Amino acid sequence: GLGDVYKRQILDILNIAIDAGKEILKIYKKNFNVDLKADNSPITEADINSNNLIKKRLIEIEKNIPILTEESLVNWETRRVWKKYWLIDPLDGTKEFINRNGEFTVNISLIENNLPIFGVIYAPEKSLLYYGIKNSGSYKLITQDNINTLSEFKKININNNTTSNIKIIGSRSHSNKDFQIWVEKNFSQYKLISICLLYTSDAADECD
């Protein structure tokens, strides 16, 4: 199994995502009119508050791992020598936030040699927390509160399908062209579904 120190670090990162979600919900639960172009719009405030919390707390865990985020992009010349880095999206699903359908997430990944080795997705409004570890599977938990154990997570069953049947989960209103090109190049058949499908029944169990 996972060592105690490793478990502690996973818990720390999961709690960072939960706390970032709390910051977003503080703003989400207020009544607001969104002016997308305004720098101090609620969406911008939620994004920045989440971003700042995640960065500060990740640095406390491991100050030597660089952080790449939409809020502070780093040029490729600098990034290409990174062996390991955090990739964060402090508020994924801005349209979902604006539409008030709750289908927005906090995303934190640890990338090593350009491949994700650990990732967290938290949908605070849906109280759904997912994490995955390379070679150890993916897990989910319903929670709005901070956690102190991994034992309550439910393992997500992964299908051993061929790549032709792999389902790709992405946010329908947050898809981008690069992602779509990558999917089409690597998978002959795919379904791009709204992240919300993760959050109904056990749809996540059907996804690879």
Regions found by a protein language model. Give the residues of each.
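Short, small-residue-biased leader/transition segments that mark boundaries at the very start
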Residues: G1-Y6, A203-E206
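N-terminal subdomain of lithium-sensitive/metallo-dependent phosphomonoesterases centered on the IMPase/IPPase/PAP
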Residues: D4-L91, E112, N146-T149, S173-K191
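Generic detector of well-ordered alpha-helical packing
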Residues: I48, E71, P90-G93, F97, ...
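A short acidic, often aromatic-flanked loop/helix-cap motif at beta-alpha or helix-coil junctions
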Residues: N75-E77, L198-S201
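Acidic beta-strand-loop-alpha-helix segment within the catalytic core
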Residues: I108-L198
